Amino acid sequence: MFEKNDLINKFLKNALKYNQSHNLFNRNNKEELQRDISESISINPFIKNKLKIIDLGSGGGFPGIITAITNPECKIYLLEKNTKKSYFLKKTIIELGLANAFVVNKRLEQENSLGIFDLITARAFSSTKNILDLTINNSNKETQYLLLKGTKKTITEELNEIDTNNYIYEIINTEEKPKERNIVAIKKTNE
């Protein structure tokens, strides 16, 4: 785990440095980024070995880069339509030597060759219903979704928009402070 911690620390330093000149994300200090890293790590107990994962709207690398660092046996596709953010992600992958991470600089609806994923992650990307609709061609009954979301109130409102005959879900509190953060774990119930 020591090597993983070194990579996370290197990522943190690079992200802070790159953000100063390129304004990648709305984080100005190490403490805020460390909370983002902790939140990203909170999905690890739900990740199994050798999964094919896509992180929607990877932005500054949360949770995608952190997932790639902490789960080297998984293949992680980082989907990011913004060219500036994609460049940062590609540069980070090279600097950290992450052979298991790949950047897709497109919108999901523009990329049909990615296939089916075992796990779909997203953080601050879109509504739950929109994520499920966008990934219909990239998921099957075995696909799990781990969506990093805010308050249970907001999540409940979003989940009221999905067809509960087709999906089962669980809301898991990450206990991240100072803001309430939760993981929404979702699976299809049928094809």
Which positions does each model-derived feature cover?
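Class I SAM-dependent transferase core
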Residues: M1-N49, I54, K84-A101
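Conserved SAM-binding loop of SAM-dependent methyltransferases across substrates and taxa
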Residues: G60-E73
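Conserved SAM-binding motif I beta-strand of class I
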Residues: K75-E80
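Short alpha-helix immediately C-terminal to the canonical SAM-binding loop
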Residues: K85-Y87, T128, I155-T156
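Conserved SAM/SAH-binding loop
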Residues: V104-Q110, F125-S126
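A short acidic, Gly/Pro-enriched loop at the edge of an enzyme's catalytic core
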Residues: E111-L119
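Conserved beta-strand signature within the Rossmann-like core of class I S-adenosyl-L-methionine
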Residues: E142-K153
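Active-site capping/gating segments
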Residues: K152-E191
